[in-house]
Design a protein with these regions (language model features):
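Extended, charged alpha-helical coiled-coil/arm scaffolds that mediate oligomerization and mechanical coupling
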Residues: 1-119, 123
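Conserved RecA-like P-loop NTPase ATPase core
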Residues: 11, 73, 113, 140-142, ...
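Active-site phosphate-binding and catalytic loops of NTP-dependent enzymes
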Residues: 62-63, 84-86, 120-127, 155, ...
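Walker A/P-loop
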Residues: 127-161, 190-191, 220
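The Walker A (P-loop) glycine that initiates the GxxxxGKT/S ATP-binding motif of P-loop NTPases
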Residues: 133-135, 172, 203
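Conserved catalytic/switch belt of AAA+ P-loop NTPases
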Residues: 201-230
Length: 230
């Protein structure tokens, strides 16, 4: 019995030492998250929310599945380009040259795009409306977006929506799900590293609804500029 008690005591001490070591690693990781958070150009409300979420992570056991979910969420927040913008080149004649060089014809379309850029230049408002390009395959809808990005010197993102039938692909998953991931729009913004890319939603007419939800409704919500933002 004495040998058994000694062995149990020894094993408990080993477990305690391992937990202490894991805790030290967890503290370093949390400190690193806080340091990265201080470099972000976000609002005081967002900074407060971030600190609240980091504190929640601090209280979570590193062996718990919730720890990885919370950590992924915080890493996603840090990966977003908060108030990071590329400088626009709103030179209308340069934009016209770029469009003419890349596309032959399409005069009405190019004229409408140039009008849009001219209004954007006059207003100086980043909240520009969405342009819808429609037509048969192969007429240059997607490549026009690439030319606009090149003319403005903005980052270019193309996101194909063909066959998308799950709302979670647009909006992302709830944090309560194991393996929860952000939606494709958030992922592409992280990839671009800029808050003002030219964002092409390709094949939007091929979005289909099924039992998993209606992605078009999720798109309306995500692309609405009115909700409160941080």
């Amino acid at each position: 019995d004495i040998d058994r008690q000694q062995r149990e005591y020894f094993l408990q001490q080993q477990i305690k030492n391992i937990q202490d070591e894991l805790g030290a690693g967890q503290e370093d990781e949390i400190d690193e998250l806080r340091q990265k958070g201080r470099t972000k150009k976000w609002s005081s409300e967002m900074a407060e929310l971030f600190e609240k979420e980091v504190s929640k992570l601090e209280r979570t056991n590193s062996q718990s599945p919730d720890f990885n979910v919370q950590l992924t969420y915080l890493q996603t927040l840090l990966g977003l380009p908060w108030n990071v913008f590329t400088t626009d080149n709103l030179n209308i004649s340069n934009a016209e040259k770029t469009l003419n060089k890349d596309h032959y014809g399409l005069e009405k379309v190019k004229e409408r795009i140039l009008e849009h850029l001219a209004v954007l230049k006059l207003k100086g408002d980043m909240k520009s409306p969405i342009i819808c390009l429609y037509g048969p395959p192969g007429v240059g809808k997607t490549s026009l977006g690439r030319s606009i990005a090149a003319a403005l010197k903005r980052k270019y993102i193309r996101m194909s929506l063909g066959g998308v039938h799950d709302e979670a692909e647009i909006r992302g998953h709830r944090k309560t799900y194991i393996g929860a991931m952000p939606g494709r729009i958030i992922k592409n913004l992280i990839k671009a590293g800029s808050s003002n890319p030219v964002f092409i939603l390709d094949e939007i007419d091929k979005v289909s609804a099924d039992r998993q939800g209606d992605p078009s409704s999720a798109l309306l919500e995500v692309l609405d500029p009115e909700p409160v933002s941080y």
